[in-house]
Amino acid sequence: MQIELTDAAVTWFKNELELPENNKVLVFFVRYGGEFQLKQGFSPAFTVEPKEDVDIGYEQQYDDLNVVVAEKDLWYFEDDHIIVNVVDHEDEISYSTK
C-alpha cells in the first residue's frame, strides 16, 4: 500500500488546508460513492484531524505534511499504489493508480 502525493498535490494541501498545523494530520479515508473507485461503491476522501484522534494504520511524510490512513480504512487502500495529484485547470485533487 502506498499513497503518493505529487509535488503539486503537496503544495495544494498546504495552501488550501493551511497545513502543516500543530499536531494536525491529513487523513485519507473511505467514503461511499464518488468517481474514483478502487473498490466498487467506495472512493477515497480526505480531511484534517488532530493526530491523537486517529488510530493510525499507515503514515507517510511529505516535507512537513503528515499523511495518514486510519487502521479501520486500511482494507480499502491495501494492495494499491494511489497517486494523488492536482488537475491544473480545475484546481481540484485527482486520484489514479500505478
UniProtKB/Swiss-Prot annotation:
<protein>
    <recommendedName>
        <fullName>Uncharacterized protein SAOUHSC_01349</fullName>
    </recommendedName>
</protein>
<comment type="similarity">
    <text>Belongs to the HesB/IscA family.</text>
</comment>
<dbReference type="InterPro" id="IPR035903">
    <property type="entry name" value="HesB-like_dom_sf"/>
</dbReference>
<dbReference type="InterPro" id="IPR008326">
    <property type="entry name" value="PdhI-like"/>
</dbReference>
